[in-house]
Amino acid sequence: MNVKILYGCQKREEIKILFSEYTKMLMEKDASIKGYLALQNYDEEIKHLEKKYGIPDGRLYLLYCDEKAAGCIGLRKINDQLCEMKRLYIRPKFRGKKLGEFLIEKIITEAREIGYSHILLDTLPFLPNAIHLYKKFGFYEIERYNDNPMDTAIYMKLDL
């Protein structure tokens, strides 16, 4: 298995496809996700990836497995101490190969190098494998930190 990670802002079309698959998967689990994505200005995010995920404060990575786009992950600045992990997604046919772990390790390393003290994330209870993975890396549950309208959202933090 040949795995490589590339900076995703230059791979807009591939990122757009992965983000679309990710949001479709979420909406299949809970239709109210659509409203949440609108609140996040999702369409603008896709048009201007650099604004949210650009260097020096953010990151967006595209993971390839055997030369095929397999997944993605983003990191965005909240403030000088806090950043947020976003859009972790591994395509179904690539799951079970520890690729999500590979991406999380990359983002944690990058967050430390940038100088952040904590990584935050929000997730949903119908993603138990993701929650388990986050906990494996040391994320723990916290109080709400954003305006996510999903009543069931779970908020997590990793101390760097």
Language model features with spans:
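Conserved N-terminal entry element of GNAT/NAT acetyltransferase domains
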Residues: M1-I17, E21, L160
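C-terminal "cap" of GNAT-fold acetyltransferases
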Residues: S117-F137, E141-L160
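Conserved GNAT-fold acetyl-CoA-binding loop/helix
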Residues: L6, S20-L49
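Conserved beta-strand in the GNAT
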Residues: L62, K68-R76, E84
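A short helix-loop-beta-strand connector motif used in the catalytic cores of GNAT acetyltransferases and
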Residues: E45-L62
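Conserved acetyl-CoA-binding loop-helix of GNAT-fold acetyltransferases
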Residues: I90, G96-T109, H132-K136
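Active-site acidic-Proline motif in GNAT/NAT acetyltransferases
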Residues: K77, R91-K97, P125-F126
